[in-house]
Amino acid sequence: MVKTQRVVITPGEPAGIGPDLVVQLAQREWPVELVVCADATLLTDRAAMLGLPLTLRPYSPNSPAQPQTTGTLTLLPVALRESVTAGQLAIENGHYVVETLARACDGCLNGEFAALITGPVHKGVINDAGIPFTGHTEFFEERSQAKKVVMMLATEELRVALATTHLPLRDIADAITPALLHEVIAILHHDLRTKFGIAEPRILVCGLNPHAGEGGHMGTEEIDTIIPVLDELRAQGMKLNGPLPADTLFQPKYLDNADAVLAMYHDQGLPVLKYQGFGRGVNITLGLPFIRTSVDHGTALELAGRGEADVGSFITALNLAIKMIVNTQ
């Protein structure tokens, strides 16, 4: 019999739709135990607002994990700093959000949990609370002391990884170095094999410049940096196609023969993916010593507590994490 695994969930910003979505997740059975790192009253109040049943059972790390039954969640309690009104940010709760992320991350690092699924956070309120915070990806990279992580978003049809993440456009060309590309492609290739079960990953690589530099007439980063790195990695046996112009890469001619796309920067690759599958996408952090997936949307403060939030991305993120757990066993 396969051992039941525990996954930990952080609902994210307490005034947003994250708690709503977690309550909605509880309305179905799951083959894993869902441990929610959150304030108990927050969850029960939000369930009452949505008119949905919810029973919280205490987290017992020394007991065997049990598949989650309908209407229940396992609670790993973290107390709010301020009471919550749905849709209204409270600066002190920025500390609460970071505490949930830290506890969940530490639990993955010490083997308590097989995966971490994160709800949407509000970066502004965390920074307003005096906590420098760029995003989940960078937070988990630092806390886990990972050498390097890679952000990848995925739908059922498309996976897009990023060579750089949250950088201003003016800084991107300088950031695309041979060392960076070697690291990013190695991590992407490794995790596609180990976490996604793809024996020989096929990766499409975007150029940085329009028309992938047009032979050096629209920038030389392809000639100076990207092509030499790809040639070296191909010589090691990796299946890499590129650099290709980003404006023509995202079509069936190329995508039908690829397992993932590597974009050079955030807004090069993600608009295509989000247009194609918004609400069904999943954010995955590659390179961490544990599995981490996330929703692909924001806090939607205006929908909190109204019963109008779509749980689809959270369900997809959880299902993908479960598949990744199976692939790594």
Curated annotation (Swiss-Prot):
<dbReference type="Pfam" id="PF04166">
    <property type="entry name" value="PdxA"/>
</dbReference>
<protein>
    <recommendedName>
        <fullName>4-hydroxythreonine-4-phosphate dehydrogenase</fullName>
        <ecNumber>1.1.1.262</ecNumber>
    </recommendedName>
</protein>
<dbReference type="GO" id="GO:0050897">
    <property type="term" value="F:cobalt ion binding"/>
</dbReference>
<dbReference type="GO" id="GO:0000287">
    <property type="term" value="F:magnesium ion binding"/>
</dbReference>
<keyword id="KW-0460">Magnesium</keyword>
<feature type="binding site">
    <location>
        <position position="274"/>
    </location>
    <ligand>
        <name>substrate</name>
    </ligand>
</feature>
<keyword id="KW-0521">NADP</keyword>
<comment type="function">
    <text>Catalyzes the NAD(P)-dependent oxidation of 4-(phosphooxy)-L-threonine (HTP) into 2-amino-3-oxo-4-(phosphooxy)butyric acid which spontaneously decarboxylates to form 3-amino-2-oxopropyl phosphate (AHAP).</text>
</comment>
<keyword id="KW-0170">Cobalt</keyword>
<feature type="binding site">
    <location>
        <position position="166"/>
    </location>
    <ligand>
        <name>a divalent metal cation</name>
    </ligand>
</feature>
<feature type="binding site">
    <location>
        <position position="211"/>
    </location>
    <ligand>
        <name>a divalent metal cation</name>
    </ligand>
</feature>
<comment type="subunit">
    <text>Homodimer.</text>
</comment>
<keyword id="KW-0560">Oxidoreductase</keyword>
<keyword id="KW-0520">NAD</keyword>
<keyword id="KW-0479">Metal-binding</keyword>
<dbReference type="GO" id="GO:0042823">
    <property type="term" value="P:pyridoxal phosphate biosynthetic process"/>
</dbReference>
<feature type="binding site">
    <location>
        <position position="266"/>
    </location>
    <ligand>
        <name>a divalent metal cation</name>
    </ligand>
</feature>
<dbReference type="GO" id="GO:0050570">
    <property type="term" value="F:4-hydroxythreonine-4-phosphate dehydrogenase activity"/>
</dbReference>
<feature type="binding site">
    <location>
        <position position="136"/>
    </location>
    <ligand>
        <name>substrate</name>
    </ligand>
</feature>
<keyword id="KW-0963">Cytoplasm</keyword>
<dbReference type="InterPro" id="IPR037510">
    <property type="entry name" value="PdxA"/>
</dbReference>
<feature type="binding site">
    <location>
        <position position="137"/>
    </location>
    <ligand>
        <name>substrate</name>
    </ligand>
</feature>
<dbReference type="GO" id="GO:0008615">
    <property type="term" value="P:pyridoxine biosynthetic process"/>
</dbReference>
<feature type="binding site">
    <location>
        <position position="292"/>
    </location>
    <ligand>
        <name>substrate</name>
    </ligand>
</feature>
<dbReference type="GO" id="GO:0051287">
    <property type="term" value="F:NAD binding"/>
</dbReference>
<comment type="pathway">
    <text>Cofactor biosynthesis; pyridoxine 5'-phosphate biosynthesis; pyridoxine 5'-phosphate from D-erythrose 4-phosphate: step 4/5.</text>
</comment>
<dbReference type="InterPro" id="IPR005255">
    <property type="entry name" value="PdxA_fam"/>
</dbReference>
<keyword id="KW-0664">Pyridoxine biosynthesis</keyword>
<dbReference type="GO" id="GO:0005737">
    <property type="term" value="C:cytoplasm"/>
</dbReference>
<feature type="binding site">
    <location>
        <position position="283"/>
    </location>
    <ligand>
        <name>substrate</name>
    </ligand>
</feature>
<keyword id="KW-0862">Zinc</keyword>
<dbReference type="GO" id="GO:0008270">
    <property type="term" value="F:zinc ion binding"/>
</dbReference>
<comment type="similarity">
    <text>Belongs to the PdxA family.</text>
</comment>
